[in-house]
């Protein structure tokens, strides 16, 4: 498990960097997407440059509801807007071996979506945030030998910027996720 909310310079991620991260996770190669021809999941080994907004792998919980049909540009604009001076926007990655993903039952995009929905509670609990205030976007990358899920998330009710996260908290998130997977 890896979690960041500041760059190597120690400064919080800018609104444009957070917006770029949305595009990066949703459209990069190896992203897992629903096929448009059927309701089956299809693995995309190469990036497709289609303009339809469903041609990305983004899913998440925004404005009180879950969706797996977000427009990249609309979500980039939304993330830019919520990336205020008083709100921390976190970038998290959960990585697996192919064997551990199989053991966890992560075979389809729906499996991964359910996994993220379930484990957002581990993140919110350890970060001492109310789960109902957490919004997130996520995308699964089936990188050879290292399937993983990127999650960009924030507390929509946050009023004070979080400058530093104790590494023990991130480790506890990792431990809790392992225990409950």
What are these regions (language model features)?
Residues 1-147, 151-181:
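N-terminal nicking endonuclease/strand-transfer module with a His-rich metal-binding environment
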């Amino acid at each position: 498990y890896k979690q960041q909310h500041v760059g190597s310079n120690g400064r919080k991620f800018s609104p444009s960097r957070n917006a770029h991260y949305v595009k990066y996770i949703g459209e990069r190669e190896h992203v897992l997407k629903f096929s448009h021809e059927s309701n089956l999941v299809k693995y995309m080994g190469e990036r497709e440059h289609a303009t339809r907004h469903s041609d990305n792998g983004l899913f998440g919980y925004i404005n009180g509801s879950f969706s797996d049909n977000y427009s990249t540009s609309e979500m980039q604009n939304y993330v830019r807007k919520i990336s205020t001076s008083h709100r921390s926007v976190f970038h998290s990655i959960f990585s697996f071996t192919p064997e551990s993903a199989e053991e966890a039952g992560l075979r389809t995009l729906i499996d991964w979506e359910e996994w993220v929905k379930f484990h957002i509670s581990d993140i919110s609990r350890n970060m001492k945030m109310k789960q109902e205030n957490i919004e997130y976007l996520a995308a699964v990358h089936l990188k050879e030998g290292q399937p993983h899920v990127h999650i960009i998330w924030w507390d929509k009710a946050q009023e004070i910027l979080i400058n530093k996260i104790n590494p023990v908290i991130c480790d506890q998130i990792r431990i809790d996720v392992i225990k409950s997977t």
